[in-house]
Amino acid sequence: MEYSDDGRFDVIVVGAGVMGSSAAYQLAKRGQKTLLLEQFDFLHHRGSSHGESRTIRATYPEDYYYSMVSESTRLWAAAQSEIGYKVHFPTQQFDMGPADQQSLLSVVATCQKHGLAHRVMDSHAVSEHFSGRISIPENWIGVSTELGGIIKPTKAVSMFQTLAIGHGAILRDNTKVANIKRDGESGEGVIVCTVKGDKFYGKKCIVTAGAWISKLVKTVAGIDFPVEPLETTVCYWRIKEGHEEKFTIDGEFPTFASYGAPYVYGTPSLEYPGLIKVAVHGGYWCDPDKRPWGPGVKLEELKEWIKERFGGMVDSEGPVATQLCMYSMTPDEDFVIDFLGGEFGRDVVVGGGFSGHGFKMAPAVGRILADMAMEVEAGGGGVEMKQFSLRRFEDNPKGNAKEYPDQVILDVPLKH
């Protein structure tokens, strides 16, 4: 099927995870004739935008993420107001680690620079602050901030898609894109070709294909896109009887991150009563079309971490439930948000490599992608776009230089 001149779109978005859905919403809201394509069913569980919880935090060692988190917090609230239900559930954010851990000290510096209210605590103050629910070693510190919380991922993606439809966007799932070509007849814009032979015409195109973005960009432009998929395992642990309410979001338990080896993160009990999410930021490299489907998780260090951190109130014998997800990793764990360039110039925008920490910033990323497709200055809100350039890997394969080696925190075995 061909969609002829009268069916042209202003922007075609390829990939309906949280980033593509957020971008489609932004575009449609601004009056752009928008098409959002997804290769699988909408709200599928084969990528990176599903599940029951993601954290939101502003405590980054990299200062340039603060403005994106701050903007996203406002945009999450605006989208919730428009849709009429909640996907963001605020709570404290608590970061912890060795007192000499440079990345954790950079988190404190970020808070100070931006006036983000925070409290730095020693082990005794941490125990008092959380009434014994969290314990840290004597040589550790903890940093508590109010800008934290949980995002409901599947619900959030559905929200953006519903809002996009409400503003006139067209959504099609089970529509896998095979290639993107220049529109030779009109001399401008692109043709998006599907594996079924359909052709969609657009003035602009945004590619947010998640773990599949490297494969698609290689086909489209013949370049090696610096993003590689990784399969990770999310673990849920049972809270011991009588202590369940102490670890709930209503009980003011925080979202949290533990710096060092391993880098551990988690959320309070919300989606599964009586269970708390605690996982390692890591996993195993994979082909998104030939995944091992787990389990692939290192449990011994995580068991020990849980045993030492939660005052014996969480069963550390092993997780009672697990879920699989994919990260789309860049070498420096920073995003790629840029024009594809080459023959496509500024007509194709790419957004990928969100490296296991991008979901919280989806509203700002969607706004930026929409700005770029509409040729509006994308650096609004103080966002430093140079950090996300595709070209940064040309001079240095490792990408952005990090001030401290431990800022690239991924725990993953070397590829063979």
From Swiss-Prot:
Cofactor: FAD
E.C. code: 1.5.3.1
Full protein name: Probable sarcosine oxidase
InterPro entries noted in UniProt: FAD-dep_OxRdtase (IPR006076), FAD/NAD-bd_sf (IPR036188), MTOX (IPR045170)
Keyword flag Oxidoreductase: yes
Record key words, sorted: FAD, Flavoprotein, Oxidoreductase
Positions with a binding annotation for FAD: 10-40
